[in-house]
Amino acid sequence: MLTNQSIGYIDAPIPKGLDLKEEINRMRREKNAVILAHYYQTGDIQDIADFVGDSLALAQQAAKTTADIIVFCGVHFMGETAKVLCPDKKVLVPDLNAGCSLADSCPAVDFAEFVKQHPGHVVISYVNTTAAVKAVTDVVVTSTNARQIVESFPEDTKIIFGPDRNLGNYINGITGRKMVLWDGACHVHEQFSLEKILELKKQYPDAEVITHPECKQPIVQVSDFVGSTAALLKHTVKSVSYTHLRAHETGAYL
């Protein structure tokens, strides 16, 4: 039972002598559970997970799992997405207060009104949204497939894109589209400073600047590579550059 609503999880002491990893593994077997962890999680959580990935990869794993219980170590909208894909399975989010500032920047009631103000538009939403926003959406995309989905529509198609204005601006720039953008953003990616990136580039002139498209356009424009979390990881492994200046979350590179 959740006794402290402010922290979103049961704050109980671990019994003395209990091996936490062994206990997690025992319960996982007994309950036929699968643990999915986002790249943003800390290393100890990633180590215990059955699968680690970005939003798209974890959604795909959730959709094909044979487990009865999905333990989703991610933010609230990710658990919702897993439940939508697997309505007959029990989906658990370890911390009920694990929120996403980007999803929070797009209240469903306000977004529905925004859609009404733009009749005749196809509504494309980034996966980082609540289930209520997805309910008024025609197509849900990830940063991995957003460009492909947008380009699948005829060029004269009127499109609303939400909630991330930075990702929307990036897609507009590389596709030549003029999508109508909802004015939302991730507070983490908003904090990256162009001035700081340029300062670090002077210190490490041989470093590659690699960026997630949720960053502001000035940072994207000076980047050597822009991509989803999975794409950034793959690029880092294959890159000939030894040093990378990364404008993204920290957990993905533990």
Task: Label every PLM stretch briefly.
Residues 41, 57-58, 77-78, 129-130, ...:
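Alpha-helix capping/helix-boundary segments
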